[in-house]
């Protein structure tokens, strides 16, 4: 190969190859994603609409299920995003699959980037489609089941930050809060991408377990040190306490994005190292 790092034509052929080989597995995962979200949204909608048939809900302008749908979206995003990331290097589980990957005429970066693209960018696109389809399924089912409830509508994703609309349920009052949550999602997702490179087998469980233990020890140590060395009779002002909420959110958002970039880059070098070891 003349270009030993990245070639667009070669990368396109690699993506096409991966898409042809993995389309059945990806389609099955998309159907599972849609099915799980549909079952949960329809189940909660039944609980609300079936037990709440008063005059107020029949003529209200806000769907009473929207608050749950908004929160469920975040849980789905983090949960399924982590699960998708844990499948990034699933083709490296067995010795035969690793040897097959080595035989592909592409650089380590192209192989890693093609897998990262599917588990990160393509997943977000398909997740939004599956979520909207699941929500529209809920709306169709209950508009026929409860025709008197005029407020049954699909949840508008812009309702999180649009403070001018009285019809929307507010999860975040400010845009900077939503940006921070998305940055946090990228960081969490990057941990599972890194875990997939380190542990191709049972990646999700191993990454979740190790991450939980590290987080518990880290925050436990911080709390213990603060409790040991702080004087409860005194009040301490930190530099962050003088910042506005928007400034603090911006800082933590930048740190989360930098952490995600670090994990993605570290995952690439770990993947490249594993390929070198396999060739030896």
Region roles according to the model:
Residues 1-99, 108-280:
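Hydrophobic alpha-helical transmembrane segments of membrane proteins
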């Amino acid at each position: 190969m003349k270009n030993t790092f990245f070639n667009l034509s070669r990368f396109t052929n690699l993506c096409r190859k991966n898409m042809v080989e993995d389309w059945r597995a990806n389609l099955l995962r998309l159907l599972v994603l849609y099915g799980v979200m549909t079952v949960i949204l329809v189940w909660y909608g039944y609980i609300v609409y079936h037990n709440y048939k008063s005059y107020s809900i029949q003529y209200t302008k806000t769907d009473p299920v929207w608050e749950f749908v908004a929160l469920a979206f975040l849980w789905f995003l983090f949960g399924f995003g982590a699960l998708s990331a844990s499948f990034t290097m699933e083709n490296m589980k067995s010795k035969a699959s690793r040897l097959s990957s080595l035989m592909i005429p592409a650089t380590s970066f192209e192989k890693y980037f093609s897998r990262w693209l599917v588990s990160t960018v393509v997943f977000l696109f398909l997740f939004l489609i599956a979520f909207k389809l699941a929500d529209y399924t809920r709306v169709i089912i209950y508009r026929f089941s409860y025709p008197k409830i005029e407020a049954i509508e699909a949840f508008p994703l812009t309702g999180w930050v649009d403070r001018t609309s009285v019809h929307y349920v507010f999860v975040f009052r400010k845009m900077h809060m939503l940006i921070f949550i998305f940055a946090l999602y990228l960081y969490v997702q990057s941990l599972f991408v890194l875990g997939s490179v380190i542990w191709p087998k049972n990646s999700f469980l191993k990454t979740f377990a190790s991450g939980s233990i590290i987080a518990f020890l880290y925050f436990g140590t911080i709390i213990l040190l603060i409790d040991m060395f702080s004087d409860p009779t005194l009040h301490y002002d930190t530099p962050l306490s003088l910042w506005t909420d928007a400034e603090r959110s911006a800082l933590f958002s930048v740190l989360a994005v930098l952490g995600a970039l670090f994990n993605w880059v570290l995952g690439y070098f770990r993947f490249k190292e594993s390929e070198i070891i396999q060739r030896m």
